[in-house]
Amino acid sequence: GMPEIQRIIIEQRSPMTAKDISRKYNQLTRPDWENRRVQIMRWALNGKLLYNWKTFGELLDSTGEKYIVEDSPKDTFWGAAKDGNIYSGVNALGRLLMQLRLQYRRLNKQKNIILKPPQIENFSFLGIPIPAILVDVTNEPYGANIHMW
């Protein structure tokens, strides 16, 4: 939903500016966001990996078997807050990145990978339903301004 707001946000050069603009529209967040946010973030991270296969994939792989933690004292759902030597929180982003690391290792020898949209009602971008996307992961770099729609 809200293609005009999505367009304003993606036109920003600064991620922080985009985030600040998005906060003005918090009341328009999808009603099912709390139940769908992990599914949507998984899809977004998969897209990030597929379009940055070598650089992002190698970065993930370089972490070995270490835990990945989003150090975030303010958001203990996506991250975890450090208290001394202990982190407490859900660390959903860190967990998703560790899953992505395994996926990268499993798929690393493939050339073409399909990114399927999550099975979510009204999952669209700029008013267009998000389709499955076939990505040639050997064709990097794509550039910072790739637009899939």
Can you name each region flagged by the protein language model?
Residues 1-149:
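Charged, low-complexity intrinsically disordered segments
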